[in-house]
Structure formats: structure tokens, C-alpha cells
Amino acid sequence: MDLDTITSISTPMGEGAIGIVRLSGPQAVEIADKLYKGKHLLNDVPSHTINYGHIIDPESKEVVEEVMVSVLRAPKTFTREDIIEINCHGGILTINRVLELTMTYGARMAEPGEFTKRAFLNGRIDLSQAEAVMDFIRSKTDRASKVAMNQIEGRLSDLIKKQRQSILEILAQVEVNIDYPEYDDVEDATTEFLLEQSKEIKQEINRLLDTGAQGKIMREGLSTVIVGKPNVGKSSMLNNLIQDNKAIVTEVAGTTRDVLEEYVNVRGVPLRLVDTAGIRETEDIVEKIGVERSRKALSQADLILFVLNNNEALTQEDYTLYEVVKNEDVIVIVNKMDLEQNIDINEVKDMIGDTPLIQTSMLKQEGIDELEIQIRDLFFGGEVQNQDMTYVSNSRHISLLKQARQTIQDAIDAAESGVPMDMVQIDLTRIWEILGEIIGETASDELIDQLFSQFCLGK
């Protein structure tokens, strides 16, 4: 594939120990040699070496930066192209100067995700692996990064390719049947083979889809909203679960003015914890904005931790709030058990019915273990599956697998009903195409461009 040479800063902007300018393409080494002065020309050094030298402005002869330059030659690189990585000091001005020089002498500024896109276009990775690269970068827990790494290593790709190969074998048998319609024994054997193989493929698709709910939680975190009246201990609960003092804990109602968010691993379950401003009527403009954001967070939650104050009797406000959340997945927490009990637990149970109830003291860190176990049990049936399993965690993949499952069921129904094989062939071909979209072999250029546009610059 004949592509130009691209360049970008591949480290976060800002001050730091190191900043890296990356080039990829057929002229990467040539462009770098125009700027680099060291013991040897970069064109003459072995691949996969790091070389000390300086970046010189060819026009002014000014020494721009002291650098270490990595030389990586095709095809054993991420993009399967020649790659140069110029390791600079991490100052903003200097690294931008080096970037500008690479563009002045022949490179083009890379688009977001273009390095990974080239890895895909050059056959280094498939589309599902490319998507997993971004999942890995964005992962907030160890479990999420492990699931993404498994996909980068090609575990999902291998399963999809295996099913596509099985479909090709069915299609080959169907072709024999179409070519020799006069032989009844061929038709019978084809139908039997088609049904047997199709049901196995459907079973494998179902197995993958069964991991979808957990996979999505692993990837995105279980969106968990802590809600309750002001000053019932919501921020203390957030701090205890994340074991940090991120939220301001005071005795003043309305202290949390915004939605606070934190990722935490709770007994193997990655939570995206959201501490909301207390939902109440208020004239404070800033607090009012926080309340509106709280309502939005509630509407998007997977789990709601509804907090009550042991030191106060239930109020109409508690009833009103619970009415808002009662049809969701809720755990009710009666907090501040270290204080005098003024709440009627039986009244609480009457209000919440069969909803799980936990009693805690965030001040004394009591009841937290029970709460964590309840969260795990509610979503994972008491057991979090092995993170080394192959999970389907991407919404696009889940949608395509559901389409494939329906289409293969259509093919099974058609074959069992005696529909002509050339009609069944249409469904089988469509399944092969749908599964190909997951790994990018049959994906449209528009889809590919859209997916890679979501990447960051330099990746």
C-alpha cells in the first residue's frame, strides 16, 4: 500500500521528562536524517536501535534539541512501515519545534488514530484489535485493561475467523448441491451438514453474546450512582469505596455542588462511581445545576445506591426520591449507624419491599464489606468470571453478533422447511459478511474512517 509519511506528537502535551515525535511511512528515516546529527546516519544504523544525537534546523544550523532516536524498520513495526520515534525533553515549545521541522521536510500531520489505522490497513491488526487498542488506553481498572489486552492479542478475532471459515465450508457444500440438483443423496447430506454446522455456529455466537453484559461492564465500568437527601453520607461512602478523600465531607447540606466520578474495582467488579449533588428544591443557582446533572446521571445509571440517614426519621423527601429510583437496580443503605437510631427500619422495609438493604457506618467503616458483596452478587450472581475469558465488550460487536444469530436462525429455519438451497445460500453469505464486519474484512470505508476518528492524535 503506497502511503505518505505521517508525523505527530505521541505523548500527552504538557511538561514532562520525555516527549516523543513519531513518524511512520516510506520517508520516515530519510526525513529524520535531514534533521538528525549523530555518530551515524539513521539510514545506516540497524533496526530496533536507539541512537543519541541532536536535532538541527537545516536552514539556520541551530541546535534545536538533544534527542534519543528510535529506528524501527518495516515490516516488524506497529504500522508495518518504517517508524522513527524522536525522544525529546518534555517541554511544549521544543517538541512542537521538532514536529514542525518534520513537516517542513516532508511529513504530513497525522489524523487522529492514523498510526493505528495504518496498522489495520497494512494487515498488522484487524478492526476488532484496533478498537481494543483504544479500549486499553481508556481502561480505568486492571480488569478492563486485561479484557482489552486479550482482544488486542486476537482472541476474539480468532473465534470470529473460525466461525467464518465454518460458514465457507457450509457454502462449499451448498455449491455442490446447487451444481448437482439431480442427486437426492447429495441434497440430503448437504442439509444434514448445514444444520449441524449452523447450530454449532449459533451456539458459539450465543456463548459470545452471553459474555456481553459482563464484558460491557468490564469495558465501561458499572455506572453506579450514589443518591439520597443532602448530608446523608453520600460523599463519605464514595470516599470509603475509593479509599481516598475526593469528595468534600462536611455537616453542611448541599456541599456537593456537582457530579463527582471515580473508577474503582470492587471485588472484581469495575464501578464507575458517581456521587451526585443531593436532589432537592433549591434557590442556589450553582447547586441547582448540580441537581439537574444528578437527575441526568440517575437516568443513565446501571446501579443506584440509595442512602438514608439512620439518625433521622423517614421524610416525604425520602419517599419522593425512592419513587424516582425504585424501578431500577437499587441497593438501599441506611448510613450513620454509629449515631442514635431515629429511623424506623420496619418502615424502611415497607417502603422498599424486596430491594436489598444494608446498614452501614461510613465513619467507622462498618458494613462496607457487606455492601461490596451485595454489589457483586447483584450483577455477577456472586461470581465474577475469569478475566482471561474472551469477552465481547464492544456495543458494535454485540449488535453485529445479534444480527448474525438472527440470520443463522433464518438459515436453519429455511433449511428445515425445505427452502431451495440457493435461497439458504443468501442467508449464509450474509452471516459471513456480518461477522467480517467485526474484524473489518467486510466493513465499509465510512465505518472504518468513523471508528479511527475517535482515536487520539499520535496513536
UniProtKB/Swiss-Prot annotation:
What sort of enzyme, by top EC class, is this? hydrolase
Sequence positions that bind (6S)-5-formyl-5,6,7,8-tetrahydrofolate: R22, E85, R124, K459
Cofactors, names only:
K(+)
Which GO terms fall under molecular function for this chain's record? GTP binding; GTPase activity; metal ion binding
Residues annotated as binding GTP:
231-236, 250-256, 275-278
Write the record's keywords in alphabetical order, separated by commas: Cytoplasm, GTP-binding, Hydrolase, Magnesium, Metal-binding, Nucleotide-binding, Potassium, tRNA processing
The residues covered by the TrmE-type G domain are: 221-380
InterPro entries the UniProt entry points to:
G_TrmE, GTP-bd, GTP-bd_TrmE_N, GTPase_MnmE, MnmE_dom2, MnmE_helical, P-loop_NTPase, Small_GTP-bd
Function description:
Exhibits a very high intrinsic GTPase hydrolysis rate. Involved in the addition of a carboxymethylaminomethyl (cmnm) group at the wobble position (U34) of certain tRNAs, forming tRNA-cmnm(5)s(2)U34.
Q: List the PANTHER family.
A: TRNA MODIFICATION GTPASE GTPBP3, TRNA MODIFICATION GTPASE GTPBP3, MITOCHONDRIAL
Tell me the protein's name: tRNA modification GTPase MnmE
Origin species: Staphylococcus aureus (strain MSSA476)
